C-alpha cells in the first residue's frame, strides 16, 4: 500500500520568510525537533552557499553521531550543475533541484533566456551530476507547477526520471491552487510518469493544508507514495506554507481521509507543542490562539453548551486528544523571580548551576561552555532547555558550526 511521508522545508522555505531570521544553531534545532517528531526528511538549506557550509557539515556530523535518528537530510539547489558540484563534497545524500516551468516564469522571469527545451536540458544535467556525486535520491522541483500545463509537466517529469530523478515536486508557488484541481492533477501526473508527485503548497488562499492533503490523496490513487512539504507553524514566504502539525492531524483525524491512508513516518507527536513553542520563540512569531493543536484556544471552551458537553466528555467537542501533543515548553530561562542564567557573558559558575539544575550531564565542559556563549550570541536570546541539552550532549559536532573552534 502506498504511504504518505513528510519532507519538512522549514530550514529552506521557512527561513526565507521576510522579517524573520534564524541562526545556524537555530536551524540545527529545527532538525533535532523534526527527528524527535519522526519526520522522514528535512530540507536543511542551501549547501552551495558559503555561509551554509559549516552548518551542513555540523548536520552531517550530528547524523553520523545518531543525534538525528532516522531523519534524512537533503539540500536544495537550483537545477544548475555548478550548484550541485559545489554541494556534493559535503556528504548529503538527498537533493531537490529546482527550476521554473511555467510560461509565466519563462517569459517574465527568464525573459527568454531559457525555453522549455533548455529547462529540460538543465534539469537532466543537474540530476545526473547529483547522482554522479553520490546522491541516493534526487527530486526535481517544478517551480510554479500549478501554472504549468499538464503536457509540459509530464514531459518535464519523464525527462527528469530518465536522468535518474526519484520524485517531482509540484510547487504551488503563488498559492493559487484548489483541493479539487490539485488532487486531479496529482493523480494524472503520478499515473502518467510512474513517479511520486511531491506537494509544495503556499497558503495565499488559506488552503495550503487542504491542497497538500488533496495532492497526497491523488498520489495514493495513482498507486504512488506521497511526499508532503511542510513548515513548523505554517511559516514561509508571504502567507506561509502548509503547517506540519495541521497536515499530520488532518491525515490522522480527517473524516474520509484517516481510514484510507497510511503514514509511513514513525511520528511521535509528544514533541509537537515543544517544537511549536520553540519555533515561535526562535522566529519571534507568536503562535495564533486558534492554531490547530498548539494554539492557546485549541482546546478552550467557554460557551455554555460547549463547556457542558466538554466537561461530560471532551470528545463531544474535540476531534483529537490534546495529551497526544505533549507538554508546552517550560524553560529555565523563563523562570520568574530570582534566577541564574547562562549565556554570552556568563561565567563557569552560572553555566554549571544551570546545567546541574536541568540534570544535564556535560560531555565536554570547556567546549560546551564556549558553545553556550557562541550560540547565545548568534541567536540573540536566552537558550532554551532543549538547546542546552543538545550542546551538552554533542559539543564536538556543534563546534563545526563555528570554524576554528576545534583548532
What are these regions (language model features)?
Residues 4, 8-10, 249-251, 258-407:
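A mid-to-C-terminal "edge-of-domain" accessory segment
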Residues 4-6, 13-41, 62-67, 81-195, ...:
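Alpha/beta enzyme core
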Residues 19-26, 47-51, 75, 79, ...:
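Catalytic cores of large soluble enzymes that bind and process phosphate-bearing ligands
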Residues 41-45, 72-75, 139-142, 198-200, ...:
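Short catalytic-loop micro-motif centered on adjacent basic/acidic residues
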Residues 46-50, 77-81, 99-103, 142-146, ...:
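Active-site-proximal loop/turn and secondary-structure-junction residues that shape catalytic pockets
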Residues 51-64:
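Glycine-rich loop at the start of a catalytic domain that most often binds anionic cofactors/ligands
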Residues 65-77:
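A glycine-rich helix N-cap at a beta->alpha junction
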Residues 174-316:
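Catalytic alpha/beta core domains of metabolic enzymes, predominantly
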